[in-house]
Amino acid sequence: MSDHSTFADRHIGLDSQAVATMLAVIGVDSLDDLAVKAVPAGILDTLTDTGAAPGLDSLPPAASEAEALAELRALADANTVAVSMIGQGYYDTHTPPVLLRNIIENPAWYTAYTPYQPEISQGRLEALLNFQTLVTDLTGLEIANASMLDEGTAAAEAMTLMHRAARGPVKRVVVDADVFTQTAAVLATRAKPLGIEIVTADLRAGLPDGEFFGAIAQLPGASGRITDWSALVQQAHDRGALVAVGADLLALTLIAPPGEIGADVAFGTTQRFGVPMGFGGPHAGYLAVHAKHARQLPGRLVGVSVDSDGTPAYRLALQTREQHIRRDKATSNICTAQVLLAVLAAMYASYHGAGGLTAIARRVHAHAEAIAGALGDALVHDKYFDTVLARVPGRADEVLARAKANGINLWRVDADHVSVACDEATTDTHVAVVLDAFGVAAAAPAHADIATRTSEFLTHPAFTQYRTETSMMRYLRALADKDIALDRSMIPLGSCTMKLNAAAEMESITWPEFGRQHPFAPASDTAGLRQLVADLQSWLVLITGYDAVSLQPNAGSQGEYAGLLAIHEYHASRGEPHRDICLIPSSAHGTNAASAALAGMRVVVVDCHDNGDVDLDDLRAKVGEHAERLSALMITYPSTHGVYEHDIAEICAAVHDAGGQVYVDGANLNALVGLARPGKFGGDVSHLNLHKTFCIPHGGGGPGVGPVAVRAHLAPFLPGHPFAPELPKGYPVSSAPYGSASILPITWAYIRMMGAEGLRAASLTAITSANYIARRLDEYYPVLYTGENGMVAHECILDLRGITKLTGITVDDVAKRLADYGFHAPTMSFPVAGTLMVEPTESESLAEVDAFCEAMIGIRAEIDKVGAGEWPVDDNPLRGAPHTAQCLLASDWDHPYTREQAAYPLGTAFRPKVWPAVRRIDGAYGDRNLVCSCPPVEAFA
């Protein structure tokens, strides 16, 4: 860490002199000395003879950026970029270069976090409101959330939403036989642990006999067939059931939307709106409902409120539905889903407008009609949008081979049927190759009269004003300027690990060799991607000490869910399906409890001591009480209190002795890599957050990847997939076999360039920075928890409860005031109300960490003035924060502090000024007056 000659030196923000400065403040002699004092001796790995950490010593030596990119290029070149006409929910598309450059390749967008601090997140909140408007307009429903993980999980959430909304004892749902196979598989995964019975039927004939809480159909179906589901909706409603329709948004520019035929829920994906297939992801799924079901929606929901000056402003609405508050009673276990991809899809719609989208849809449909016309009597359905199904008795393999020989992949339904899907990238030449593969001549196009939509859509200015590249470029810049992302400032969010997302790591994700791969393409087309997946799995095994890894979960929440399902299936395989108790410490993140509930488990809370550690006596008592039914313990390590618990080995042993499994939540793995391996100190399963520890950017709230790592006895129960026989036989949790595969090169590049030494140094540096902050700020804000030697892990919790009691100043006041100092706030009131959890990561420099500390010290001085009575508690720079340029330029200024104190509390030279777009937002107003779609914010003035 001296001459910045290696990637690790550039990734890690501290050079050797800065490390020495921090260690002196902490009071330790070296990084290794810090590790010995912070990490329990019983789990701390001893370096091997090679000087590397066990496991990591088998990683390949660190590569330079150029070397890693050359290796990635070789992997990319091992793929074949065929023309995909497979369809089945994944379609080729053209990403407008202005969106590629200004969103996907722009750190102002991809390095942002979930917009929990709305005053400094107005840009992406507006973009997400555009996304919600896109979905509601096209589906004909009233409320949509801010994205789902993919279409399959959106379908699963639609199913459970209908079950909640039905509020009855019935636990049966009927699914149309023409729903996408992968969607049906994810539905089956979700239904089983919840005791929901799925009945599969051809719903064109109406509902089967019996009681159902809901029905699920597809529009168009997997076969390409378009069905008018209005009669089904009426029949279902007459029998007290709800209806969810998986709808193709591009098709909905032409055909009547689900909301207009009376459907209660619509779900699907926005992938074909400019988002590459990416071997399965990431893509932004969607979920839309009638307004009466708004509180049943899972995930994030952006709404409009007002700030303290009455200015309209955006915020996350109805957060009391979510897992971080309601825990096992939440509507879902998902956090934010696919924000970056939702923004891309929304801006694709904005760039094309209603007319442009309709033109694309008509062109796609025209190509399908051309193929249908040539197929003649071989055509199975006469109502279709983009996909035609052909009857070819005994010739399916021959047709596929002929098309493949000319660079096109079709979809084999069975030995007698082939389907062909057209998309935005389809050309007349492609159509000619397809016809040749079928052995038919071109003919007059068929005319499938499908244009049944009469309602307008996307009439809001957000979808009419940005049709030129100049206007779109400036719009995206204007939105980004309203936000704080890592390109402007350290984001010290505890439990979030907002580290550098290096350009070299990001570069390859836009390569067509990765982006234009269909997840169900022939394996021979994706040899390079499959090798990359295998590399990454093997490296994560070495890093974690487990035996097998699945990369399918496309979020940490889904990794949790997959791990718990593996535990459940393991117990069932041993004749113990009754084991359904999941022990969870009171300090745990709410996602743990929500995931356990989704996996069909009953949550029993384990107490924690005042110092934050798990109460071992209470754990043993509850293990004993529930020994016969004990399934698992979920525990985060290091703990959510930011310390290494010294009893972790005893905790794991107590659970194992009773026949339970130990789930070690990997959210804080950034404090373990190269130091300790959960698979070796007692864990049976962990999920990892590649978007935290392993450098996939947060994207403003997604994408993420949440691999699940297990010991050998759980490996057979890892997620499988109906179209991936090479995977284990477990239940799929995502639509695609390898989840969000196209962003895996980011983590591959990070590990490849860091090497064993760099990975360990990253962990040690993150711990160093956190302990340095704890030492510097402890006299101003007491550090709530430390380990046995007075050390924290990679984050620390600052306790403001005493300050609040004495002065009335709250964590919310401090968080908002930090924006005036140019910083994003730490995590508020988690895991303890009235506290701030700070995580600096290894990527920040000493200067940036010191600036944050100076800001916090400056804020404490302001708090003291309130406490001394110099400023009233209801009128001071903290309570008035954040301050916009508009409020400072107002002719009237009747506050006891000056405008200069408001805007530049440490002077104009402190750091570049961040101007919040709005003042403090009234959350309660937004929930009482729920508005979750456009027009843009100015229209509410």
From Swiss-Prot:
Membrane-traversing stretches: none
Sites bearing N6-(pyridoxal phosphate)lysine, chain numbering: K692
GO biological process, one term: glycine decarboxylation via glycine cleavage system
Keyword DNA-binding: no
Keywords from the named record: Oxidoreductase, Pyridoxal phosphate
Catalysed reaction, written as an equation: N(6)-[(R)-lipoyl]-L-lysyl-[glycine-cleavage complex H protein] + glycine + H(+) = N(6)-[(R)-S(8)-aminomethyldihydrolipoyl]-L-lysyl-[glycine-cleavage complex H protein] + CO2
The organism's place on the tree of life at top rank: Bacteria
Classification via InterPro entries: GcvP (IPR003437), GDC-P_C (IPR049316), GDC-P_N (IPR049315), GDC_P (IPR020581), PyrdxlP-dep_Trfase (IPR015424), PyrdxlP-dep_Trfase_major (IPR015421), PyrdxlP-dep_Trfase_small (IPR015422)
Example of a GO cellular component annotation carried by this entry: cytosol
A Gene Ontology molecular function term of the record: pyridoxal phosphate binding
Pfam families: GcvP2_C (PF21478), GDC-P (PF02347)
Assembly and oligomerization: The glycine cleavage system is composed of four proteins: P, T, L and H.
Protein name: Glycine dehydrogenase (decarboxylating)
Lineage: Bacteria, Bacillati, Actinomycetota, Actinomycetes, Mycobacteriales
